[in-house]
Regions:
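Small-residue-biased structural context
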Residues: 1-145
Length: 145
């Protein structure tokens, strides 16, 4: 059973905003360290950023998939398609994080790795916006004329 914060738009939105804000800040900090040529510290910051994605963003995705999405579909079976798309977004985020972990071991903080970190931000922002729209906004009822 999903916790109450997942079921309320304002609380769910706050979780999304907090998670994304933290990821943006940590990404910017890592990039600033690279600009200052603090490569060792930047690499540590990248490791912390990966951990942040796993423990904050992806753990939220896991919680959604472990009950919240099922509850939403049980309440409205028409949401099954939307939930499938949202779950796919989570899979994309997981894949990007896994790719970053492999690439960073092979190439360090290469431009490709930095692009992947930015891809996470974009996918997550779009996913959160779509999730809030698809699962929380009530459809406008058609007026009978």
């Amino acid at each position: 059973m999903a916790g109450p914060s997942l079921r309320q738009l304002h609380a769910h939105h706050a979780i999304h905003e907090g998670g994304l804000s933290g990821a943006v800040t940590k990404t910017e900090e890592m990039e600033e360290l690279l600009e200052m040529k603090e490569f060792e510290v930047a690499r540590q910051a990248a490791d912390h950023l990966i951990d942040y994605w796993e423990t904050r963003i992806l753990s939220h995705a896991d919680a959604e998939e472990d009950g919240f999405y099922q509850e939403m579909v049980e309440g409205n079976p028409d949401l099954a398609g939307a939930v499938a798309k949202l779950t796919r977004d989570h899979d994309i985020l997981r894949t990007i994080v896994a790719d970053i972990k492999v690439r960073i071991k092979e190439t360090g903080l290469s431009p490709e790795v930095l692009q992947q970190f930015h891809a996470l931000l974009v996918v997550n922002a779009i996913h959160s916006r779509d999730e809030e729209r698809l699962l929380f906004e009530q459809p406008v009822q058609k007026r009978q004329v």
